[in-house]
Amino acid sequence: MSKFADLLKSPEPVLVDFSAEWCGPCKQLKPILEQLKSKIGDSAKIIKIDVDKNRTLADKFQIRSVPTMILFKDGKSVWRQSGVIHASTLEGIIKQHSK
């Protein structure tokens, strides 16, 4: 978990997608995040966490539903949302916190 904590302290935004393999909306979100990753390049990191395999992290960040995305900047949570979101909206949120 210390590698994860170090990653969150990154000066560029880090989007963490808390999801599960059995989750339908998580499967809908996957291509959106892949598209976003190709658009934003190295300006932000996108990480997927399986809540069933990483229960400790899910509990630490109080994940009650999946998918839940949390955007971190300099180790702090700056945005959070549960559910599927449009790629352009998500891109705008990341760009807003990239400055």
State what each model feature region is.
Residues 62-70:
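Structural micro-motif
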Residues 73-99:
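Non-catalytic, surface beta->alpha helical segment in thiol-disulfide oxidoreductase systems
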Residues 27-39:
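Typically the conserved alpha-helix immediately C-terminal to a functionally engaged Cys/Sec
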Residues 15-16, 46, 69:
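Hydrophobic beta-strand anchors of alpha/beta hydrolase catalytic cores
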Residues 1-13, 55:
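A short beta-strand-turn-helix
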Residues 11-12, 18-22, 65:
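Short pre-active-site segment immediately N-terminal to redox-active cysteine/selenocysteine motifs
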Residues 51-57:
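Structural microenvironment flanking redox-active thiols in thiol-disulfide oxidoreductases
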